[in-house]
Amino acid sequence: MSAHLILIDALNLIRRVYAVQERPFIQIKQDHDDELSASTLKQVLFNTQNTCVNALIKIIDQHQPTHALTVFDSQEPCWRYQLFEGYKKGRKKMPDHLANKLIDIQDAFMEQGVDSLTSDEDEADDLIATLAVKMALHGQKVTIISTDKGFLPLLSPNIHIYDYFNRRYLDEEHVQSKFSVKTSQLIDFWTLTGDNTNKIEGVSGIGQVTAAKLLNQYGSLKAILEATDLKDSLAEKLTQSLEQMDLARKLLTLKQDIPLGFNLKDIRLTTSSSAHEINANINLTTDDKS
């Protein structure tokens, strides 16, 4: 029997839950041109924590994993901000009261037998990618719980992505329907178009339709750049954007080689009686060659 690891993109879950819990009070706040009272904030945070814990329980119950981990972003800027100071520029900052509540939510997750992972240097996305790929290389199943499209390039027979809020898997069919390219072409696709969500610029004048058309015709960005039959105007745009495309690719590509320093058995669910016997010695560090 194989292992099944659930990786929860914690802030993706928590921020969405918080927004739903806060929403009923937003209009009241606007009508009175005032901040929410301390008691109201306390109730919103209490509801957020309870809803997140209930979501965790539902996820475990639905997917029946043998192992699970919630992965958090650090509150400190990651390496991508050092590479590009405009990364995620303009994105709404997490409210301090919610940021201060994260440790309590982590503790609540731990009470359910699910530990948390955070890195000061790397984003949760990089940690999740490293874990997912490591498990997949060992032939084990991974399900990533997130709505973040950045995980889509990881899709494989052993790596699945589940949107908890819309109750659906984000699969190859979803990628083709939304972007009109293959999963293996997504990084090239976003390198050309840019990623507005994270404020990553692409090639000026190339949108999703053109990018998809080029990738479907030539197969990859490398092949596009080597093509000799491009229109002069397009070839010029690409030539002028080589440096930007290199930066975009670095920002868009998730790390898969972060040293983690623990074994699969460390994150097994104690409620899974067989989990201790299932591949319990898989070393989730990058120096494991087994």
Curated annotation (Swiss-Prot):
Annotated InterPro entries: 5-3_exonucl_a-hlix_arch_N, 5-3_exonuclease, 5-3_exonuclease_C_sf, DNA_polI_H3TH, FEN, HhH2, PIN-like_dom_sf, Xni
Residue ranges occupied by any 5'-3' exonuclease domain in the UniProt entry: 181-275
Signal peptide: none
Keyword DNA-binding among record annotations: yes
Names of the cofactor(s): Mg(2+); K(+)
Binding-site list for Mg(2+): D125
GO terms of biological process kind: DNA replication, Okazaki fragment processing
The enzyme's E.C. designation: 3.1.-.-
Cofactor binding note of this UniProt entry: Binds 2 Mg(2+) per subunit. Only one magnesium ion has a direct interaction with the protein, the other interactions are indirect. Binds 1 K(+) per subunit. The potassium ion strongly increases the affinity for DNA.
Start and end residues of each stretch annotated as Interaction with DNA: 205-210
Record-listed K(+) binding positions: L192, V203, I206
Keywords from the UniProt entry: DNA-binding, Endonuclease, Hydrolase, Magnesium, Metal-binding, Nuclease, Potassium
A GO molecular-function annotation: potassium ion binding
Family membership: Belongs to the Xni family.
Role played: Has flap endonuclease activity. During DNA replication, flap endonucleases cleave the 5'-overhanging flap structure that is generated by displacement synthesis when DNA polymerase encounters the 5'-end of a downstream Okazaki fragment.
Protein name, as recorded: Flap endonuclease Xni
